[in-house]
Amino acid sequence: MQRRLIGKTVRGLALCLAFPATVPAQTQDTLFTERPLFVAGDAVLAAGFIAAAVAAAPADKWFTRQLQDEARQANRLLSRGFTVGRHWGNPGTLIAGAGIYAYGTATGNRRVQDLGLHSAGAVILANVVTGGIKVVAGRARPHVDTANARDFQLFRGLRDDAYRAFPSGHATAAFAFASVVTAETSHWWPDARWPVGVLTYGTATITAVSRIYNAQHWASDVLVGAAIGTVTGLKLFRYQHSHPDNTIDRKLLRAGLQSTAGRWSLFLMPARL
């Protein structure tokens, strides 16, 4: 039974990771045109994540036991890799987004600036959603009791961080960043689409698994977090580019820095790329 559940979970997660890479290609020809915020493909993406989370829930304890195994916990390579993944989820993604935006601003490269602003924005927005759910759901983290994966209590998350397991904020941030960066690079630099997608979604997956390894989340927590991050990132990308005159982009994407006679000053870049 558990093997079937695990197989379904793996297949569902594979579908979730593969599908976002196809979405940006659909946006290339209509990037600056009005289009619906939600399309049929979004339902497929959401259904894939939901199916994976539902399949994983009965096996939450199994995944935790496997990753909490003494041999795996003592493995230095795994420990270091998952430590990097944990730090990437928070604060790495936000720092990376802010750094990319700052570099684009300093060099006057609006495409890079666009990439940084939207990736950081997706991380923040997705974690606002996740943070609200955490407080309401009140799910106990695995380190509280590894034998009880169904310990939920409404609004208990207000009381203690130990009861903010569902969903994973680190997974949310990592997948939000991955979805926006992959979407943006797919449009501006099509040849980089697959390398960037594999790198960002692969790193996001390591971040998600690290949270189970560190007994901070159940498998279903990270899958739902990944869903929120991916969907939020794709929605923000679609909205920002189909509404290029939105307030945030209008104010923050036209700012640049230039050096004149040894002095730095702000200037406005063209309204369109």
Region locations from a protein language model:
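Short, glycine/alanine-rich hydrophobic alpha-helices that insert into or span membranes
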Residues: A46-A55, G97
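Hydrophobic, membrane-facing alpha-helical anchors
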Residues: I50, Q68-A74, A176-S179
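Alpha-helical transmembrane segments of multi-pass membrane proteins
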Residues: A52-T64
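Extended, hydrophobic alpha-helical membrane-active domains that insert into or remodel lipid bilayers
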Residues: F63-L77, T105-L115, W189
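Short coil/turn segments at secondary-structure boundaries
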Residues: F63-Q66, A96-G99, T146
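Interfacial helix-start motif at the membrane-water boundary
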Residues: R76-A98
